[in-house]
């Protein structure tokens, strides 16, 4: 705009000087005064023309310089973004940046108890998943847990925290920004009723892919338990929190319920939190939790991958036409003792005849070791990796009492009859009023604690 004004003023000035010369010629003829005025005017006209030429060249060079700086600035921002990725340093985003990246939070790709997840594209072209954590007390607790747990960890089988956005205002939600994982979560690939609900992906994961997912998740948990400065307990291991990348390799996500503990701590007491079917018995019995609680949840996930079904379901009893709880791990344990292990495998895998029976037996044995009632009997995740990769033989696990089933069945019966009862478990007697608040705990299991 300034250049345009300068050019207009210069043109008007030149025209004015030309008019002065013409007027002087008419009035003064060819006198000495005319030549003096003409000389001064011509000098001024030449000066204005020189000014325009110099200014034009200067503006052209300035535009080239600005363009080059802008290009270098973009490259610098991209390079800086790349360096932050390599270093694993989370970026603090403004809310406006996340709104722009997610198109006003319109692209919803997931929703659960800890928040909603939206797909987004950042200014540098990176595809991200933006998790919105809402609620004051719960949101703040989960936000701090998740940032503390994952900000400093880097592992190929753990989702990477790209950045975050927080506000001092209690009413504003908090955001966590993760790498976008294209094939969504494991549940829609192993449970038949999850693949047709409008979510991206969906289908039947092959046996080979399931086995690799088992190894990937084991490595992720082993890293959290043994290779970090503080032990990190995930405390919400389940198919919904296991994502699959473009090569169907597993990436563990959602650290909203995680807990950091010192390396010299063997177990800690904490409030019951998690998802039904994946909670270890020691958690329900208020004996304190440890990394072996994650091992238990992992074992349940293994069984669900093998069978293509949930660990807990309600089935109708033909005689009474009432529904009762059916616990898949108990069925697996029984079939293994009867040497009918192929009867529990996902029928879709049987139909395509791609299942190795020896691998099924190995995976079932590993899973049953992982869900032993006594946490000391469970292997740690490094041992699980050794067993899955064939470096350590897998022995047949001991028969299980399946404590969780007794707890669930007791509460299920009491809910329908209103009768108080004592649940007898080997070496353990639990009474409602004196030693254990069974009803409150089991009811929290039956209705999902974390409805995701």
UniProtKB/Swiss-Prot annotation:
GO molecular function annotations of the record: ATP binding; protein serine kinase activity; protein serine/threonine kinase activity
Annotated keywords: ATP-binding, Kinase, Membrane, Nucleotide-binding, Phosphoprotein, Receptor, Serine/threonine-protein kinase, Signal, Transferase, Transmembrane, Transmembrane helix
Gene Ontology CC entries for this record: membrane
Location(s), subcellular: Membrane
Annotated catalysed reactions: L-seryl-[protein] + ATP = O-phospho-L-seryl-[protein] + ADP + H(+); L-threonyl-[protein] + ATP = O-phospho-L-threonyl-[protein] + ADP + H(+)
Signal sequence region: 1-23
Binding site for ATP: 109-117, 131
Residue ranges that the UniProt entry lists as topological domain Cytoplasmic: 55-452
PROSITE patterns, alphabetized: PROTEIN_KINASE_ATP, PROTEIN_KINASE_DOM, PROTEIN_KINASE_ST
Residue numbers on the Extracellular membrane side: 24-33
Cysteines paired by S-S bonds: none
Name by which UniProt lists this protein: Probable receptor-like protein kinase At5g20050
EC number: 2.7.11.1
Naturally occurring in which organism (per UniProt): Arabidopsis thaliana (Mouse-ear cress)
SMART domains xrefs: S_TKc
């Amino acid at each position: 705009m300034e250049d345009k004004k300068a050019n207009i003023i210069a043109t008007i000035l030149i025209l004015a000087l030309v008019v002065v010369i013409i007027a002087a010629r008419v009035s003064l003829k060819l006198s000495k005064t005319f030549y003096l005025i003409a000389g001064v005017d011509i000098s001024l006209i030449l000066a204005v023309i020189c000014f325009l030429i110099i200014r034009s060249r200067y503006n052209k060079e300035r535009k080239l310089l600005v363009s080059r700086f802008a290009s270098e600035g973009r490259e610098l921002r991209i390079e800086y973004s790349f360096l932050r990725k390599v270093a694993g340093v989370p970026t603090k985003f403004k809310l406006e940046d996340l709104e722009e990246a997610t198109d006003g939070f319109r692209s919803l790709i997931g929703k659960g108890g800890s928040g909603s997840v939206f797909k987004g594209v950042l200014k540098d072209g990176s595809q991200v998943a933006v998790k919105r954590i809402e609620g004051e007390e719960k949101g703040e607790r989960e936000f701090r847990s998740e940032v503390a747990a994952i900000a400093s960890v880097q592992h190929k089988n753990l989702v990477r925290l790209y950045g975050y956005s927080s506000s001092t205002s209690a009413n504003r939600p908090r955001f966590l920004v993760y790498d976008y994982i294209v094939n969504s979560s494991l549940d829609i690939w192993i449970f038949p009723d999850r693949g047709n609900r409008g979510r991206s992906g969906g289908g039947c994961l092959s046996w080979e892919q399931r086995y690799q997912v088992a190894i990937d998740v084991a490595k992720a948990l082993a890293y959290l338990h043994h290779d970090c400065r503080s032990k990190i307990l995930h405390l919400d291991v389940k198919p919904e929190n296991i994502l699959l990348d473009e090569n169907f390799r597993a990436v563990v996500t959602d650290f909203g319920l995680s807990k950091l503990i010192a390396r010299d701590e063997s177990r800690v007491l904490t409030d019951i939190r998690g998802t039904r079917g994946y909670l270890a018995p020691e958690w329900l019995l208020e004996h304190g939790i440890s990394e072996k609680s994650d091992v238990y949840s992992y074992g349940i996930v293994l069984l669900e991958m093998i069978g293509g079904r949930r660990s807990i379901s309600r089935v109708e009893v033909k005689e009474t036409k009432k529904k009762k709880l059916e616990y898949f791990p108990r069925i697996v344990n029984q079939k293994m003792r009867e040497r009918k292990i192929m009867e529990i495998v996902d029928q879709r895998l049987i139909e395509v005849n791609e299942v190795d029976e020896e691998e099924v037996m190995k995976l079932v044995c590993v899973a049953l070791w992982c869900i032993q009632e006594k946490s000391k009997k469970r292997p740690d995740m490094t041992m699980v990796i050794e067993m899955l990769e064939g470096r350590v033989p897998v022995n047949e696990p001991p028969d299980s009492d399946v404590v969780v089933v007794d707890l669930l069945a007791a509460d299920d019966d009491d809910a329908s009859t209103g009768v108080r009862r004592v649940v007898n478990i080997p070496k353990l007697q639990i009474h409602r009023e004196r030693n254990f608040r069974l009803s409150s705990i089991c009811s929290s299991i039956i209705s999902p604690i974390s409805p995701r």
